């Protein structure tokens, strides 16, 4: 199974790291969505079965970003951070599953996902938090 991971962070994170090695920055989710589209389209020659966005832009911005993604790009999942949101359930926007696992080191998020590799999409999933002892 081929999995594509794409990272999205806020301009604030870039400014705080002051790292010249970071490539690209996004002022808004429209710019981020356009960049995700370019990355996904650049990998069209590879049979990508599953695409994950790892973000640090906040839960509501994750939802907003998902609404702007073209379903043809094949983004399946957003695992986010920044706002430290702990939703009771993962949410779906525009066919993209989204979750965060709260803040600190109290818990981690766990997805169990069945992928339909014939159609390159999520067949089923469960999401929950797992306490860290």
What annotation goes with each model-predicted range?
Residues 1-133:
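Acidic, metal/ion-coordinating pockets
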